[in-house]
């Protein structure tokens, strides 16, 4: 079996991890391993695994990599404080493999890359709750005592709770902020009236300090507060100009400061802020620190990254300072915000009964965000870093490219063959280059043997994606296949998520730039349907606009629900 798999990998074929797990578990000669995870809250989960017997060095390396990927995905999805491996302690090959884990995952290092990324995240989460540092342990398989069956969350009247929550927006002035990898989208509301929206393009991966990351978010929130403090007819020209998408930060700052100075205490009108942030967020605190958004900070040797990133957890307090009275600020991961938004809209529809399964949603744009709202209305305190899962242990030629090369299957933040290079805009570039390099004419540059999308003097990443989506919707050449394949890759993530988390929900709601063109979503859905039997992919577009504010957004002529839906959902999330 292993020889055949390696031959396929050398031919640049993918070897999907969920299928490898299933095949190895069926192999009667494979050696069983149980991976028991102790989460940060003390609960435990078992993950069965099987390791096939190898015959040569190449096969041994492949089996080692398979186990590393299994461990990595468990920690990327769930995190935890201990992973105990139960296996035959009389098998020297397995003992030797176990002995490599501490080094490969860099337990003793301060600065980590690759597999060590999930250990850094576990450490930040542990420090936030006063827990111990992560560790590996081993035990003989014969000592394994099965865990009791986990309790099934009792379905709650989630639809009624969400409808009641959304009614709380009446009489309040609120702001929703959706932070992405290439832009920030905001929406402001006065009661059930949508006052304004704002889109600001940025490139946070290039920032070298936490202040560069926080300042635009805070300034743009102040801009929304200015708009709420004045009747629309009384907005000065400078404020209207600042709302334009192409308004630079210095112009926005001048408009905000002038408006704040003229209003004095009358600027104090903001009741709450909901913020969607593309990183691990637990208890309103941003705790991950390993996403591409903070790559520039991680590479800045002039700063202590851990100390700098810790200051980002103060974003909630900085936003609260912009609110009147006690205010209310709630922050969550972009995927969880997508799940909450979908649930709120479902609660106001004839399909509210679907909430009995809970809701899983993805935001698909620069990255892949994943969120999960359980049937009891809780958001699991899990990282859900599905964008960073290792999906493909094959495709050796594509893996050989540097992570910064658009042809590579390796994530830039970890150097590992991660899901981000199979979904989102990075996947669109990679697949377009593989299927027909001509699709990228005029958008790429070559430097040091690497191919990438030009980002200066003009950032062409978003225009390139728009170009590919337009070609795909028009049925031009290989462009449609780009998005069919991305849909198929999303199905692989779904299979791996089902294996790791066993959610009840049998639908996936999709938000983001990939949804705003119906023809592109249709292509994604084709690929997804072929690989995720029994699971529906549902677009979060105007058809999912049921709350008062989302209906108001759908009625706006120049913006779409697919683009600004999470910003509006963030408004309601501020009330949780």
Write out the residue ranges for each language-model feature.
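Short beta-strand-loop/turn "lid" adjacent to the catalytic site in phosphate-handling enzymes
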Residues: 88-104, 234-307, 507-517
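Proline-rich low-complexity regions
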Residues: 140-142, 278-280, 328
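Anionic group-transfer/hydrolysis microenvironments
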Residues: 180, 278, 336
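Gly/Ser/Thr-rich beta-alpha loop segments that engage phosphate groups in nucleotides
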Residues: 183, 278, 367-371, 514
